Regions:
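A short beta-strand motif characteristic of beta-propeller blades
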Residues: 26-35, 82, 88-92, 311-315, ...
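Repetitive beta-strand solenoid architecture
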Residues: 40, 105-106, 322, 329, ...
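Beta-sheet-dominated scaffold domains
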Residues: 340, 347, 369-530
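Short coil/turn segments that connect the beta-strands within blades of beta-propeller domains
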Residues: 52-54, 106-107, 330-331, 385-386, ...
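Extended, beta-strand-rich, solvent-exposed assembly scaffolds of outer structural proteins
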Residues: 40-45, 52-54, 58-107, 113, ...
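N-terminal beta-propeller domains
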Residues: 1-78, 224-377, 438-457
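Short, exposed beta-strand/loop patches in secreted or surface proteins that constitute
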Residues: 45-48, 100-104, 125, 182-187, ...
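Amphipathic alpha-helical scaffolding segments
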Residues: 118-130, 340-355, 394-405
Length: 530
């Protein structure tokens, strides 16, 4: 687009559609953080809380077997901030500059270490069939109940005037008389509860009545709710198999009103043999701004999985994989890992599990894969009005729903483009376009993308073509300012900051320009506070 006589290169200028080409604003020296190499290979981030409270921070690289550390300065007063580490938190800082992702939400910054594999807590030890229930559903004149337990048989016949309670009492006495070691039998309203402390209860059966249908026994599971007694022992957990399909079963726990046994109610619960959820030491950590100039790095208190098992309420897909980026969208906290996108419950950012194993609600977590015929490793995400634009090394995707509201049932991921891009430098949003880069061995190409919905390919332009080979491949930072309509690049091995600025009125682009600034020394990081 250059015309004869136009400027070939602009250093330390600032093109403006109103004032023309002016000098850039002057730099202000605020303070000295160290030598020119003190913070080399550190991950820098900028936090803007209010106009009067802003911070510049960095994560120093781990080296020589030692973990990294966090340093934060007040960007207004330049006071060094106090950093406190929660239990085991600093052990999470094992990476260097390119191994971290930082997402700030209000007073918290979510730090993700891309080197660490997310893990679940260990499955608890579960001893099957150490509890059992004998339930009678009918009694009549001289009803006979025949049962077996631990290879022993017993038989009880009721008298003319025996009640349910009397029949249960006789069955309890018959079992007690077998003298089975460490077996406790408790009589309740309509059943007997059996528990054994040192071994499984083997071969528990019972029949009753002329048609052998007036009594039944179960241990860790029942086929339907009808088999459950009206009372049980507190915290007694039973699996309801339902249709028999793995995804149709669920678990119920009995809650006694007095905390021991007797009257109470059943509530949905977690399988006793299943992990309670996420291992916080392997998950992203939070840097909390506790007060002015005070920060605490700590493990996040993730909400435990409360219901179901690995089939009906599975762990998020990132378990067993490395999380590459965190993001916030539609009132949900999300994570990228391999080819999957995992998002929290709506409004409950640290809850990655379903509320119930029996049904899916719109607020439940979302977990989808962007798999195609090509290998996919998602590394970046940009929220847009059409949904989430997902980026991998060679493909771009759009994750969204027809009505714009992301739910487990309605959300889909579709491929929208197939551009090669850099996986280290994240794309940025300028308000009207998304900019991303692609590197060659000697220079950097810059692209601008405008999404047009899930059913249309985006418009993509190579905006760096007019300055081909001008931006070196050594840049490591890309930022944007929607307010000032520019993007900027910097690298820790160069003094130059490279800018692209455009001005548009509607769809009519009035100004497009490339220029650079020369800093006094190599640029560690840049940020736009607008």
């Amino acid at each position: 687009k250059k015309l004869p006589g136009q400027v070939e290169e602009c250093i330390n200028g600032y093109p403006d559609p109103t004032f023309g080409l002016t000098k850039r604003p002057g730099f202000q020296h605020i303070g000295n953080l160290g030598t020119g190499t003190t913070y080399d290979n550190s991950k820098w981030f900028f936090i803007s809380r209010t106009d009067d409270e802003k911070y510049i921070g960095c994560i120093t690289p781990a080296s020589g077997g030692s973990t990294g550390a966090i340093a934060v300065w007040n960007a207004v007063t330049f006071a060094a901030c106090n950093i406190t580490y929660g239990t085991g938190a600093q052990a999470y800082l094992t990476g260097t500059r390119t191994d971290y992702d930082v997402l700030t939400i209000q007073d918290k910054s979510i730090l993700t270490n891309k080197l660490i594999t997310a893990a679940k807590t260990a499955d608890p030890t579960f001893n099957a069939n150490r509890q059992g229930t004998i339930k009678i559903s009918g009694t009549s004149v001289e009803t006979t109940y025949n049962g077996t337990i631990e290879g022993n048989t017993f038989s009880v016949t009721t008298d003319n005037n025996d009640t349910y309670s009397d029949a249960l009492g006789k069955i309890k006495t018959a079992i007690d008389n077998l003298n089975i070691s460490n077996l406790t039998v408790t009589k309740l309203k309509d059943n007997l509860h059996l528990s054994r402390t040192n071994a499984a209860i083997g071969g528990l059966t019972i029949t009753g009545g002329p048609f052998a249908n007036q009594a039944n026994a179960f241990q860790d599971q029942v086929a339907t709710l009808d088999e459950l007694p009206s009372e049980s022992m507190n915290n007694h957990v039973v699996k309801v198999v339902n249709s028999g399909a793995l995804t149709s079963s669920y678990f119920l726990k009995y809650v006694a009103n007095n905390g021991t046994s007797g009257p109470g109610y059943y509530e949905e619960t977690l399988s006793p043999s299943t992990s309670t959820g996420l291992d916080a030491s392997t998950m992203p950590h939070e840097l909390v701004n506790t007060s002015v100039n005070n920060f605490t790095l700590q493990r996040i208190s993730w909400v435990a999985r409360a219901v179901g098992d690995d089939d009906t309420n599975a762990h998020p897909s990132f378990i067993g994989n490395k999380i590459t980026q965190s993001f916030f969208h539609n009132n949900r906290l999300g994570f990228l890992s391999a080819d999957t996108v995992s998002m929290s419950q709506s409004g409950d950012f640290f809850n990655m599990y379903h509320t119930s194993a029996q049904t899916i609600t719109d607020s439940d977590p979302i977990d989808l894969s962007a798999s195609t015929v090509k290998p996919v490793a998602l590394h970046s995400v940009i929220p847009s009005t059409q949904g989430l634009v997902l980026f991998s090394a060679n493909q771009q995707f759009l994750m969204g729903a027809a009505d714009g509201i992301l739910t487990p049932a309605k959300t889909v991921i579709r491929t929208i483009a197939n551009y090669e891009m850099d996986t280290i430098i994240d794309p940025v949003d300028t308000g009207t376009t998304i900019n991303f880069i692609s590197k060659t061995p000697s220079y950097t190409r810059v692209f601008a993308m405008v999404t047009r919905g899930e059913n249309e390919n985006p418009q993509v332009a190579d905006i760096g073509r007019v300055v081909n080979e001008w931006i070196p491949s050594t840049v490591d930072t890309l930022i944007s300012s929607a307010q000032n309509q520019f993007i900027a690049f910097s690298g820790q091995t160069t003094r130059y900051i490279y800018f692209f600025r455009q001005y548009a009125e509607g769809k009519d682009i009035k100004l497009q320009t490339w220029f650079n600034w020369l800093a006094p020394g190599n640029v560690q990081t840049i940020a736009a506070d607008s």
